Amino acid sequence: MRPATALIDLDALRHNYRLARSRHGGRALAVVKANAYGHGAVRCAQALAAEADGFAVAFLDEALELRAAGITQTIVLLEGVFDAAELEQVVAHGLWPVVHHAAQIEMIEQAALARPLDIWLKVNSGMNRAGFVGDAVGSAWQRLRASGKVGEITLMTHFARADEPQVIATAEQLADFDTATRGLPGPRSLANSAAVLGWPDAHADWARPGILLYGADPMPGEGNGLQPVMTLESGVIAVRDLAAGAPLGYGARYVAERPRRIGLVAMGYADGYPRSAPDGTPVVVDGQPSMLVGRVSMDMLTVDLTDLPQAGIGSRVELWGRQVPINQVAAGAGTIAYELLCNVKRVVFRYRG
């Protein structure tokens, strides 16, 4: 069997959820959209089911997958519904849709619902991606209430730069949210992962921890005690001696400056490892630090074994996880941990805890 695996530590997932809930102080939705950021939504939700206050997904199909797997807690649909036909299933399965534009209000007004919906009303406080702005927030709230088809209305917003504590954008968004929602009753939900960790003023009734659940710290410094949930590993499948001056891989990006011993690893960009990872990107081979050399191929990559004489065919190679911080790999590749995690595929997933 090909040795590429993603080891998912469910104890670490639970640790991170508890940390988020403790730091925030209120209830916390575990965000498991995008297949739990590549970790497996059903397995992650089941692991958190005994203690999570609820879950958040992007759209209806993701929620239905959780319901079919026995998840009974609150599930929020962060994109809301896409057409009126979805409202029947939303009601039937007890889901809470986000309402972020007027067409969704019209769907609710015109629908024949078996019972009132609890909804989350999204405020655009400065990210300018989705939601109602300024006075339109109050108007939307009044329309929803006047429809007679909604129960509790939770007011929410989303921060664009909460992971940049030195800039004032988040403080400005908080002020804009407070102005737009002044006088409107109901719970509030403001804090994403970065705000849970770095913006106490954003702590309200509901937090929405996402990336932090999976152990990738969104804040500079990474001193928040998160534990990595995914360890991406594979094995050395061949070893080659490379002479000084010899090129390696596509484009001859790497040229050996001295004789090198190279390990070929069964992992490539088709598995989700970034093709843009540069020479020198850290890896760990049999518990010892090493590095990527040469361009990542579709199914394979190459690592330096020169100073690891005991390493050879069958040696385990950690690409990120417990020993190799995913944020370090992402930064070198010019991307973010979110993208790397969501892109993992073609590997065997193994769960523990």
From Swiss-Prot:
The keyword Cell cycle does not apply. SUPFAM superfamilies: Alanine racemase C-terminal domain-like, PLP-binding barrel. It comes from the Bacteria. Substrate binds at residues 129, 298. Its EC number is 5.1.1.1. Pathway: Amino-acid biosynthesis; D-alanine biosynthesis; D-alanine from L-alanine: step 1/1. The modification N6-(pyridoxal phosphate)lysine is found at residue 33. Its cofactor is pyridoxal 5'-phosphate. This is Alanine racemase. It comes from Azoarcus sp. (strain BH72).
